[in-house]
Amino acid sequence: MRKIRWVVVGTLLFAGQAFALEYQWNDLNLTLTNHASIGAAMRMQDRDLDLIAKTNVPGQQNLCQVDDCISFSHDPAPNMRLVNAKGAYFGINGDNGDLNYDRYALVSATSLLDSDLKIGYGDFLLRVRGIGYFDPVNFRREERHNNTLYQGSRSQRNAHELGIFARNGRLMDAYLQYNFSVADRNAVLSVGQQSVRWGESTLIAINSLNEINPPNSAFLHMPGAQINQIFQPVPLGLLSFDIADGLSADLLYQFGWKPAQPDAAGSFFSTSDIAGGGQYAMISLGAFPEDPYQRATPAKPSLASPTSILGLISSTSFSTRILPEKYGAPSNGGQYGAKIGYNANWLNGGTELGFYYLNYHSRLPYASLYAADDSCARHSANAAIALVDCHGFNGSLTAQLQQNLGIVGLAPLEPAPIDTVKVFLDYPENIHMFGLSFNTNIGSWAVSGEYSYRPNLPLQVQISDVVFAGLQPALPAQDQDLTNLAAPLGITLPIPSVLTLPGAGSAFPGFLTKYRGISEVQAHQLIRGYQRFKVGQIDITGIKAFSSNPFGADQILLILEAGATQIYNLPPLDQLQIEAGVAYDTHHGPGADGTGTPDGKPDTRHINPTQQTTGFATRFSWGLRSIALMEYNDVIFGWSFKPQIIL
């Protein structure tokens, strides 16, 4: 939703009329229907620099290069340089799509073919449907990188990203259906990959009753794609039957899980460089530039920054490889549900009612991780003992330190293994959904609505707090005074009189560990990035067709939808924060600039540059969505023109 503020896309779409081949012989019926479309979209506005990473803003490539915008001598100036700079703190993991397309650039030009084969024989029906698409604009486009300290200015997109939205073929429906009757009641059994639409929500898909078929966001943003192409068919068995006049039931069991498909990382509408084929994540709140190959190391002392001592003792980078996408996938089994449908002829001249239950595994990914390795100084009593425990540390001075200690040849150990945290996309299992819906007519409007309730819906904990929890083992348990470390070793360092290496509690004070009662995070401990809550959601939809209109269209279909979500028993912000995905994300803990500290004074031991106080999920939220579908038939050579206006 946040990109609505800055994206205006011009779209041109020509949808070819469907053409079909039909064949019939006795009880055998064969139909092949093909639908082709061509569409293009163009970016119409410049970038908003507040939405891209601080180190990706033009002129700020070296913003923190000299000192990592961190001070070990309690000097607030490096952090304030970061705070005052243009750009988004957390944008480093979500701005590739913004950087790849300039104003007036085509962001997509998709040709799409949807082929649907149906073979009927008596009471049996076999359906196989597939979609092929090609986008020459994105298939040939390279990734663009503003910051080139640790990578080139251009790079090739990986095959997985290209397959999501640039060139691929996808099997959609593939199922066998059998129509029969029991006690003079009609019944249908279908088995295979298919779509089952529950509920009445049209434009608000997330957390609606229409949960069975996960959406494909890449298809949603393809100019020319149809609504029936957005939701992915899944493998399941479905039994639909009449119980009595006006009363019916659906029973289903899903035997194959599929996730929602996010926009490909780096595509125009993407909001994450991790989900959708991303291969690495930056552990950064604005200070560290993109480093896909883990080439960067902490800053070292210089004339410009004599206090940057981390590089003397550590070789950690500030990026990490993402575990394979399938790592956090749930099991295929254990997903089932039922629907009861009732046609209430006595209500408003005819109203369809539905009652639902579904047990399913999440289609949406959550950011979870395994905690970092233990710092070799995690339990060292002081810096001198840490020097021995770490075999002379693991930085640029290691060889000299080992020689002075008389331990040459021992493998150096890492005091700050920040880049050993392991991030993965997590899909929680066994979410329960209960719901009801209605569908009726009021005047010339088709009006429908639904309510869904989930007693154990996972919600994403603020990602920076999840990361802070995972980084607890990567620093000493207590602050380490490094001031007197150099003299006993005979080393002259360009350092001031006070130097402090912050402990984990000072650098990464978090909320998630306290909320879950974790006294000490262990190395490699699994940190689930979600917390389950009771959540209810209501949607109301109105649809009206206009054949007579001032735009000369053959028809305009107007869809209006309102929705509201309630999170029950959401804890206050001083206990836990739920991610809302704003560009200015930092962390709700105290900032190095003094925000959130008891006395308001800067405390440079904190990695968090400034406290975030807004932009979290709230107990109640609501919104409106609308779409006008305009149709101009047979514009030229049998092609139709179908512009869409989405608000």
Name the predicted role of every residue range:
Residues 38-44, 132-136, 193-197, 253-259, ...:
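Transmembrane beta-strands of outer-membrane beta-barrel pores
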Residues 120-278, 623-625, 642-644:
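Outer membrane beta-barrel
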Residues 34, 113-119, 128, 173-178, ...:
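Residues on the lipid-exposed face of transmembrane beta-strands in outer-membrane beta-barrel proteins
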Residues 106-108, 358, 448, 515-647:
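Detector for outer-membrane/organellar transmembrane beta-barrel domains
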Residues 50-95, 139-162, 210-222, 263, ...:
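Solvent-exposed loop segments that connect transmembrane elements
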Residues 28, 107-111, 167-172, 231-235, ...:
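Residues that define the transmembrane beta-barrel architecture of outer-membrane proteins
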Residues 20-32, 44-47, 107, 117-126, ...:
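Short loop/turn motifs that connect adjacent beta-strands in outer-membrane beta-barrel proteins
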